[in-house]
């Protein structure tokens, strides 16, 4: 599913071709017991599901894109919600015509390479709690352990 090398509190991670990226990141974090940190990377995909929050209705709209695209930016944070690992990842994808699409990354199927850096902030965590005003799962700093 992936290969990696550790450098201090950071991991350089390469996900295997044709794997689903979000699932691979989650599996890696679970294997390494990472409950607070960040992830960033680049790569290429053949399919991606992105999510956009419409603040007027406090509801998400998903879009599925099935085309070869470059990951021009993938960035996110790692925390927990209700004691479970919670990934909040955004991505920007470059299309063949040099336009870009982006949003909250729900899933993406790798087609080429996916090279990531995962930083582990160490023991503890920051939780998440639903905020009815925004419709978002926001940081909950009262949670300190996963």
Language-model features and meaning:
Residues 1-88, 92-146:
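N-terminal intrinsically disordered, cationic/polar leader segments
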